[in-house]
Amino acid sequence: MSIHDITSPLPGTFYLTESPSSPPFVEVGSTIAAGDTIGLVEVMKMFNPVTSEVAGKVVEICVASEDPVDVGDVLIKVEEG
């Protein structure tokens, strides 16, 4: 199995949840499908969904919610399969 990095498509602030009281989109161990939302990047008060390009299991979350991110920063790592 290979590990796939899901990276930030935009510079901004990364969020693992839709709102402060919502559960996270993903956690370590979560099974995801291609196209699933894994988080949001806020840019100028606009929230942009970040989706997975692959199906698999989340093995690492590389940034915390509300961390600043730049284009290409690794957000999560997914074991494909």
Label each PLM-derived region with a short phrase:
Residues 1-40, 55, 81:
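Acidic, low-complexity mobile loops and tails
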Residues 3, 60, 64-65:
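Generic detector of contiguous secondary-structure segments
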Residues 8, 44-48, 69:
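Flexible, active-site-adjacent loop/turn segments at secondary-structure boundaries
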Residues 9, 53, 63, 69:
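Short, acidic, Ser/Thr-enriched surface-loop or helix-capping motifs
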Residues 19, 43, 49-52, 63, ...:
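Short, conserved catalytic or interaction motifs in soluble domains
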Residues 29-38, 43, 66-75:
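A structural signal for short beta-strand/turn segments enriched in small hydrophobics and glycine
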